[in-house]
């Protein structure tokens, strides 16, 4: 098994942290997006979207998307439980996982895409969209601060993904 990784990616970082918290030893293969390594025929055969992270199993099966990779690793290595201990815990973890992706991560990625140098020749950048999205992200961060107030963890009583 090996993990194809883009070190600065928050999604790849989520998987690396998950692996570390599980105490797993999975070799990491860094992929350089800046040089187009993720667009080679070999990589696209593993993940047709060319994104990271990607977990390649020993039999050649490939799992993309950080949530799916974490789910697989949790099922194969249930201790310590990082996706919840029972049905209610798992539902709460899933709820917060989804909220973080939709309310914070995707908007932050949009800001990066519409302002980042590496994207200027790949997409039509709309700086005004980035400005408005930045305001929305700031509001969501304030919301998150209120949700975290007085809690050790956002998704229940135990440490989770």
Region annotations inferred by a language model:
Residues 1-131, 135-141:
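GST-like domain detector, emphasizing the conserved glutathione-binding G-site
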Residues 82-85, 153-157:
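Short histidine-centered beta-strand/loop micro-motifs
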Residues 108-109, 154-161:
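GST superfamily/GST-like fold recognition
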Residues 143-155:
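Hydrophobic alpha-helical bundle segments that form small-molecule/ligand-binding pockets
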């Amino acid at each position: 098994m090996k993990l194809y990784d883009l070190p600065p990616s928050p999604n790849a970082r989520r998987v690396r942290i998950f692996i570390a918290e599980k105490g797993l030893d999975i070799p990491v293969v860094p992929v350089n997006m800046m040089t187009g390594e993720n667009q080679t025929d070999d990589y696209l055969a593993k993940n047709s979207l060319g994104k990271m992270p990607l977990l390649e199993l020993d039999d050649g099966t490939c799992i993309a998307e950080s949530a799916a990779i974490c789910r697989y690793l949790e099922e194969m290595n249930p201790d310590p439980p990082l996706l919840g201990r029972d049905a209610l815990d798992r539902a709460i973890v899933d709820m917060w996982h989804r909220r973080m992706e939709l309310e914070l991560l995707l908007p932050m990625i949009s800001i990066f895409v519409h302002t980042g140098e590496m994207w200027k020749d790949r997409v039509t950048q709309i700086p005004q969209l980035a400005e408005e999205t930045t305001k929305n992200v700031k509001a969501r961060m304030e919301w998150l601060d209120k949700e975290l107030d007085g809690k050790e963890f956002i998704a229940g009583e135990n440490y989770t993904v």
